[in-house]
Amino acid sequence: MATKPGVLTDWPWTPLGSFKYIVIAPWAVHSTYRFVTDDPEKRDLGYFLVFPFLLFRILHNQVWISLSRYYTSSGKRRIVDKGIDFNQVDRETNWDDQILFNGVLFYIGINLLPEAKQLPWWRTDGVLMAALIHTGPVEFLYYWLHKALHHHFLYSRYHSHHHSSIVTEPITSVIHPFAEHIAYFILFAIPLLTTLLTKTASIISFAGYIIYIDFMNNMGHCNFELIPKRLFHLFPPLKFLCYTPSYHSLHHTQFRTNYSLFMPLYDYIYGTMDESTDTLYEKTLERGDDIVDVVHLTHLTTPESIYHLRIGLASFASYPFAYRWFMRLLWPFTSLSMIFTLFYARLFVAERNSFNKLNLQSWVIPRYNLQYLLKWRKEAINNMIEKAILEADKKGVKVLSLGLMNQGEELNRNGEVYIHNHPDMKVRLVDGSRLAAAVVINSVPKATTSVVMTGNLTKVAYTIASALCQRGVQVSTLRLDEYEKIRSCVPQECRDHLVYLTSEALSSNKVWLVGEGTTREEQEKATKGTLFIPFSQFPLKQLRRDCIYHTTPALIVPKSLVNVHSCENWLPRKAMSATRVAGILHALEGWEMHECGTSLLLSDLDQVWEACLSHGFQPLLLPHH
């Protein structure tokens, strides 16, 4: 929102929320109906193609968003290092409004202007005319309109909304108040209306011009440099006709320079080109990948989780993962992504953060939960994890944390296999079990004297049970085999606090520590108001409305941890899994040992918890009933 929002700041359909697409629905239905029912010789192909073209523009913009987030994660050719936050993502979540607005105007124009009906596919003279008009009047008028928008009166009421994003993403290009978009549409309509009135318009000239605007807008705000220097060497005048991402980035960091739309010619003419333009361009081109201190190695969970990655759907990734209705419409892309990940065996960088001079990255292995459970896939997945560890070691990474199923006991003995295979590697492996156990223990209400533990037992579960028994808390199990397994791990002097519980004695236990494999029947046995606290990496399915469900082991990150603008799987905003935080703590504290394998480290739980709090990480608040 602008500093002092002016008239026509909000879009007309803002009150409709996610139902705003109903605005375009009647036109889309009408154009399709006309195309199907009209005589083939009288069909208006241009009218029919408006809606598919709008969908193409959405896809085009999304491709740019994903590319930008992918390249800026690694650091190569990144222009501005400063991170973005959830406020920026929320502010830019309505980037499709301008496509909706254009679509409505296109439909109205085709119905009102006889010249806009039944356009041919191609007219060379119309394409040349549109290009010349854009180079002259459009670029010239935009330059002065842009300068006017930087006057205090208009800037505070309108244009400051756009400049709220100092670090730009491709969609930042279209984040303006409604009034500005009206002005821009009038400006960009000049070439289109001219070709219509001169009867030189064509479907290609209309679509091509709009795609050109979208492409240049996205490129100019993508925050990584992609125009090679040799293009300007081969054709020096191109410097005046085509801007670069670093050129426009200076406008967002310096504000009073580089006003031109796409052609720097007018900044050269009027003396508003930033003096550091060429220096920044060359410096950015030479920039390599970031030097990384801590890597969190995770993987995809479900086919739909690809959209929840930071490089996926930006607004969707900014909220905890939940299956949404629109995912059914995306099944063609979901299927393609599944096929792609089947053959694409390389991990990729999904996210970067920084904290206390540490550079952090999240790497993703393109495999799903189901594939980790298949015995015949375990060797291949282990090889991928091992390659990731060796790559991190080669790059000088200090700590690598194994997230989700990358640290499975059956898969690699909680990471111990890699230490055995590569005893000389310098990177330290962390499974996060100490911190995860500490988080669960400190999530148990202070006055609790007894807890129920059930589900598939893990290293974390054994650690929690042993620690609670040592503290005098009674740990009850529902299954005899669980009781025997935990008993073998609990120190002998504390075994009196371990109980095999019958169903009749459950009423006094209001705290349940649960893992994967907890059944519906077991949940139903819990009394009303029970608090379920997961000790597993994956959340418990919430079947009881009369009970309280805690998140998986996680912590709220301190404000000094920057570039946090997406949610980690099902966790709330500004929360990180205990495994991921454990890797960061390992580097901050300078601990030299590996923290993985099957051994329990009961004596270190208080140490890791105190270190966590001292660095500003905070436990998640208990969810409201």
Curated annotation (Swiss-Prot):
Similarity comment text for this entry: Belongs to the sterol desaturase family.
Protein name per Swiss-Prot or TrEMBL: Very-long-chain aldehyde decarbonylase CER1
Reactions that this protein is recorded to catalyse: a long-chain fatty aldehyde + 2 NADPH + O2 + H(+) = a long-chain alkane + formate + 2 NADP(+) + H2O
InterPro entries per UniProt: CER1-like_C, Fatty_acid_hydroxylase, Sterol_Desaturase_Related
Enzyme's top EC category: lyase
Factors inducing expression: Down regulated by cold and dark stresses. Up-regulated by low humidity, osmotic stress and abscisic acid treatment. No effet of methyl jasmonate, GA3, salicylic acid, cytokinin or auxin treatments.
Keywords: Endoplasmic reticulum, Lyase, Membrane, NADP, Transmembrane, Transmembrane helix
Tissue: Expressed in seedlings, stems, leaves, flowers, fruits and siliques. Not detected in roots, pollen and seeds. Expressed in trichomes, cotyledons, shoot apical meristem and leaf primordia. Preferentially associated with young leaves rather than mature leaves. Expressed in the epidermis of the stem and caulines leaves, in the carpels and the sepals.
Cysteine-cysteine disulfides: none
Membrane topology: Multi-pass membrane protein
Subunit annotation: Homodimer. Interacts with CER3, CYTB5-B, CYTB5-C, CYTB5-D and CYTB5-E.
Main function: Aldehyde decarbonylase involved in the conversion of aldehydes to alkanes. Core component of a very-long-chain alkane synthesis complex. Involved in epicuticular wax biosynthesis and pollen fertility.
Effect of residue 159 to A: Loss of activity
GO molecular function, one term: oxidoreductase activity
Transmembrane intervals: 45-65, 126-146, 177-197, 200-220, 329-349
Knockout-associated phenotype: Glossy stem and fruit and reduced fertility due to the inability of the pollen grains to rehydrate on the stigma surface. Disappearance of the wax crystals. Decreased C29, C31 and C33 alkane contents. Increased susceptibility to soil water deficit.
BP GO annotations: alkane biosynthetic process; defense response to bacterium; defense response to fungus; response to water deprivation; wax biosynthetic process
Residues annotated as domain Fatty acid hydroxylase: 138-272
Annotated localization: Endoplasmic reticulum membrane
Organism: Arabidopsis thaliana (Mouse-ear cress)
EC number of this enzyme: 4.1.99.5
